[in-house]
Amino acid sequence: MAAADGDDSLYPIAVLIDELRNEDVQLRLNSIKKLSTIALALGVERTRSELLPFLTDTIYDEDEVLLALAEQLGTFTTLVGGPEYVHCLLPPLESLATVEETVVRDKAVESLRAISHEHSPSDLEAHFVPLVKRLAGGDWFTSRTSACGLFSVCYPRVSSAVKAELRQYFRNLCSDDTPMVRRAAASKLGEFAKVLELDNVKSEIIPMFSNLASDEQDSVRLLAVEACVNIAQLLPQEDLEALVMPTLRQAAEDKSWRVRYMVADKFTELHKAVGPEITKTDLVPAFQNLMKDCEAEVRAAASHKVKEFCENLSADCRENVIMTQILPCIKELVSDANQHVKSALASVIMGLSPILGKDSTIEHLLPLFLAQLKDECPEVRLNIISNLDCVNEVIGIRQLSQSLLPAIVELAEDAKWRVRLAIIEYMPLLAGQLGVEFFDEKLNSLCMAWLVDHVYAIREAATSNLKKLVEKFGKEWAHATIIPKVLAMSGDPNYLHRMTTLFCINVLSEVCGQDITTKHMLPTVLRMAGDPVANVRFNVAKSLQKIGPILDNSTLQSEVKPVLEKLTQDQDVDVKYFAQEALTVLSLA
């Protein structure tokens, strides 16, 4: 390649070569990330004739550099002269698609898929398809796995003779000796099926699907379950029973729990793909078995799908199927030995209320909710409480309130701070559903207790919780019930609690407005400017800066300004700094 002697146009390429050969990975990475700038400077012709061959030859670098290169090349079409020259990008990407590191290969495949759309049909056949064939017939499994992701993007736009060849290559990959290749083929089978003609789906994809679904490796079989969804969507209803269902039944009872888990995980999609009749005859019994599976992971995956499955049952049989076939299984899952299973069920079970309506909810679901509210696992109780809105719409929450209260109190005092945090986040929702009287009587004291929790994240969440409660119940309520308690904390011996008063005033002032802030909260803030602890004093300055915009100008001048000016003379540097900042921001300086 030409040297950079006195020729400015060559300068960027010289820098690039120097940096690409530099010992320092970071420099090599930076130069790769600037590749588009360099290509622009070189122009399309030299990018094609010099830069790309150079890059193709240097593919033996750190994975991070190769990953950046694979990504860059996917956006290079205009830099090589547009679609008619896009095939020049194939050699470096082909090399990248064969490297050992999976992340690099995947990125190269992603870029190849992107630029495939910019090839004309004749260029696809002349350049892209030969690349796919080379990768698919490569000696290393890495190139064969990469090939699997390239069939669906070129298949629709090539001649029928080439299509037949591509199908043959894909068939070979599905029966490759290496499990990693069969896995890659299984994971792309569904998307390949989508671009095939229906006759070929029936005659060629279905046999591949059946073979992969009975592969000796469970990691291959479980990917065939994913493909099943796509294939079932493509076939007419009358073919499903013969072509797909035997394989699906076999997967639902597979000896490997990972395959059964995949069936449970994809159940909603499978259900929609096969339609109401097959659901009634086949999927309902299969779902019952998955809910009773011996492996907890499978039961948990099925539990997650309970609500969606019931929602999607056809209206004529929905209630009957739920009451006679699904509910008995749910009742067993409520007292499952595994807490993940119970927790998964608790996150969706409330959603059955709107489906079953008021009477069935009260008779059948309510006892289950109450049992779950008393469960020893906090996640179960939390999941029930966080989904109360579904039930509230159907039966009103009063039915639950007697059991709710002990559950809420227990969670509010749970030893794990993350559990306490989660219940705080649901408090505004609960408050809105339970009403102000119930809240004041039973929950107000909890909300105040959180303000003095020993974990800062809880105190912080409790503060913003107060704001949301005032938004729900109004500022008069705040004035009567919350503000007096918050202000009382300003005399607490613990300086952290005194600071919490300031944090609460910051957020309450936003929702309570000028009148309440000026008359009731400001005097406390101003008084706290004389606190013995510097941390409290500088938070006074921050609070005044925060609530200043809410106050009227005369209050700012007569009450706030003197206090801030006094704080600028404080012996503590932080107090001085924040007081000065507040004066500046409020335009009082």
UniProtKB/Swiss-Prot annotation:
The keyword Glycoprotein does not apply. PROSITE patterns: HEAT_REPEAT. Residues 85-239 are annotated as: SV40 small T antigen binding. Pfam families: HEAT, HEAT_2, PPP2R1A-like_HEAT. The keyword Repeat applies. GO terms for molecular function: protein phosphatase regulator activity. Each HEAT repeat appears to consist of two alpha helices joined by a hydrophilic region, the intrarepeat loop. The repeat units may be arranged laterally to form a rod-like structure. Belongs to the phosphatase 2A regulatory subunit A family. PP2A consists of a common heterodimeric core enzyme, composed of PPP2CA a 36 kDa catalytic subunit (subunit C) and PPP2R1A a 65 kDa constant regulatory subunit (PR65 or subunit A), that associates with a variety of regulatory subunits. Proteins that associate with the core dimer include three families of regulatory subunits B (the R2/B/PR55/B55, R3/B''/PR72/PR130/PR59 and R5/B'/B56 families), the 48 kDa variable regulatory subunit, viral proteins, and cell signaling molecules. Found in a complex with at least ARL2, PPP2CB, PPP2R1A, PPP2R2A, PPP2R5E and TBCD. This is Serine/threonine-protein phosphatase 2A 65 kDa regulatory subunit A alpha isoform.
